[in-house]
A protein has these predicted regions:
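Substrate/ligand-engaging "lid" and interaction regions
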Residues: 1-206
């Protein structure tokens, strides 16, 4: 099993002209990505000798089990992405970074990550806090304009795999629903029901 962790917003529409000027040729397949990257490979350390990916400048970990890295990443990176995006969009915020820096939405994201999703994982708390703090720093990357609408594609299956397990675990452990995750689901439903923005107001285009 392997895991790749890297935020890849896709085609850099805003900067493509400057990029082509720098390259001195047209490349319509340019993909933007953050500098951070992690490649986790479930294999013995000896494999590193046969596959010295680090010599190519890649951040690769050879580990006995990929599972805890997968669970941590899906829960504390993908999970918040999935719920913050519709909440941000319906609030008139288009970029992940701006959502994190928003007075209200920023607190919402922090609550979902630290007070709800983190409580559902069985990994060392300090390790989880450090990972979550690093994720927030990545979300705030000033060089990457990550559109929330790109994250909102296929929101229902994303929520089912990234957030619903945490919601169920939280309910089982705490005896109550996690309000942030419930709000995220409500925002997804609102968006897919036809909720649109106009002059700062949320309108419905269908019943």
């Amino acid at each position: 099993a392997t895991l790749v962790d890297r935020i890849v917003p896709g085609f850099p529409r805003k900067d493509i002209a400057a990029i082509k000027e720098k390259l001195q040729y047209d490349d319509n397949l340019v993909v933007q990505a953050e500098v951070f990257h992690l490649w986790v490979i479930e294999a013995p350390q000896e494999v590193a000798k046969e596959f010295p990916a680090d010599k190519a400048g890649l951040n690769v970990l050879f580990v006995p089990s990929e599972a805890p890295y997968h669970e941590r990443k899906v829960t504390l990176l993908n999970g918040p992405h999935t719920v913050l995006s519709p909440v941000a969009y319906l609030s008139g915020v288009n970029i992940v970074r701006d959502a994190c820096q928003h007075e209200v939405i920023g607190k919402y994201i922090h609550k979902v990550m630290f007070d709800e999703l983190m409580e559902t994982l069985n990994l060392p708390k300090e390790e989880l806090k450090k990972f979550a703090e690093d994720v927030l720093e990545r979300f705030n990357n000033p060089f990457v304009d990550h559109a929330v609408t790109s994250i909102m594609l296929n929101s229902f299956p994303k929520y089912e795999t990234r957030d619903l397990p945490g919601l169920k675990t939280y309910l089982q452990r705490k005896g109550e629903l996690p309000k942030g995750l419930v709000l995220g689901l409500a925002a997804i439903i609102t968006y897919y029901k036809g909720g649109v923005r106009e002059d700062g107001c949320l309108l419905y285009t269908s019943p």
